[in-house]
């Protein structure tokens, strides 16, 4: 293989990565200005303020030392999240389909699990000043009950993150394997080849149900309303992000936008059969999917309260059952 033959795909991946990160920084502004603000009948912030300029602004903010038993590990978690999302992005890129150990659904699920687990660690490693006045119960000398376990906002957020990993991730991961059952392979290249021969999975009954289940899992993974329980402003405020400042907060903003784009590309590959090839017409389909999913999410979020356990568990259970049903239909037909 010549040097130029190897260089061109690498350059294409790098350019696509830069565009994906840029689009990811613009999407939050589109959500807030053109969807949520219109629903609430207000002008809304500039498109670039919520993502692009927010990430730049945080770079110039003063860093703080978190009140953590392992401050270095705590501050490294946003970087770990970004790396995990980057690996999912590389799995989706068609230039990497020859690397079977990378371009398969098992690897994608593993990297997404790393991203989810990071929030559990962040919550357990942070003990912010915001939690200092919320000790349960009274620890003042002479109190009736003493020596009880001190509870922190971040501990609550960490336990919620663990709950999201155990229960909330079922819909997304079931949806990912519906195209695999239909195509008979967990490798992205085979799934795309199947759809090129038989048509997009989303136009089948199993695929249509799977797309709905995927979207529910998409919102859960992004911790968006009504599933924003790990950083609910009403009780845990910012949750695991509480003590992240400066460049570490920039990584939080950057990673969320990048994850939105990456999940959109993953949906396009699995349910439509269009890989993100930069210099092809198919990239237009990918861009449409990337934009449509967060717009629908913003509409749902604008009309949704934060779910409590009473609403969260039935929603996840129903979505999981739909995912199982779709897999059964895909296996039979």
Please give the residue ranges for each predicted region.
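Membrane-water interface at loop-to-transmembrane-helix junctions
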Residues: 197-208, 236-261, 281
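Hydrophobic alpha-helical transmembrane segments in multi-pass integral membrane proteins
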Residues: 174-179, 323-333
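Interfacial loop-to-transmembrane junctions
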Residues: 297-323
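Membrane-interface amphipathic/juxtamembrane segments adjacent to transmembrane helices
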Residues: 31-62
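Alpha-helical transmembrane segments
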Residues: 10-25, 99-114, 199-221, 281-282
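Juxtamembrane/interfacial segments at transmembrane-helix boundaries in multi-pass membrane proteins
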Residues: 2-9, 82, 99-101, 176-207
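Cytosolic juxtamembrane amphipathic/interface segments immediately preceding
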Residues: 56-73, 148-159, 240, 244
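Alpha-helical transmembrane segments of helical membrane proteins, especially in multi-pass transport
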Residues: 220-221, 227, 247-281, 289-298
């Amino acid at each position: 293989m010549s040097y130029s033959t190897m260089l061109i795909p690498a350059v294409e991946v790098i350019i696509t990565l830069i565009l994906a990160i840029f689009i990811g920084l613009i999407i939050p502004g589109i959500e807030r200005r053109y969807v949520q603000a219109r629903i609430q009948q207000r002008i809304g912030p500039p498109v670039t303020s919520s993502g692009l300029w927010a990430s730049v602004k945080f770079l110039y903010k003063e860093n703080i030392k978190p009140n953590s038993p392992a401050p270095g590990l705590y501050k490294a978690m946003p970087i770990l999240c970004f790396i995990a999302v980057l690996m999912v992005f590389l799995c989706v890129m068609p230039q990497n389909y020859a690397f079977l150990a990378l371009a398969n659904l098992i690897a994608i699920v593993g990297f997404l699990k790393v991203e989810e687990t990071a929030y559990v660690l962040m919550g357990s490693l942070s003990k912010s000043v915001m939690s200092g006045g919320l000790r349960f119960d009274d620890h003042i000398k002479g109190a009736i009950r003493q020596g009880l376990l001190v509870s922190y906002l971040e501990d609550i957020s960490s336990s919620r993150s663990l709950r999201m990993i155990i229960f909330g991730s079922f819909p997304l991961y079931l949806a990912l394997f519906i195209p695999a059952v239909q195509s008979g392979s967990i490798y992205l290249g085979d799934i795309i080849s199947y759809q090129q021969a038989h048509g997009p999975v989303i136009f089948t009954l199993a695929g249509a149900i799977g797309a709905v289940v995927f979207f529910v899992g998409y919102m859960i993974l992004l911790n968006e309303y009504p599933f924003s329980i790990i950083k609910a402003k009403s009780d845990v405020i910012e949750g695991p992000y509480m003590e992240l400042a400066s460049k570490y907060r920039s990584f939080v903003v950057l990673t969320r936008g990048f994850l939105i784009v990456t999940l959109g590309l993953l949906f396009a590959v699995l349910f439509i059969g269009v890989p993100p090839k930069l210099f092809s017409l198919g990239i237009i389909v990918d861009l449409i999917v990337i934009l449509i999913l967060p717009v629908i999410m913003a509409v749902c979020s604008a009309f949704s309260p934060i779910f409590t356990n009473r609403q969260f568990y039935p929603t996840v259970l129903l979505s999981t059952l739909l995912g199982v049903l779709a897999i059964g239909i895909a296996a039979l037909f």
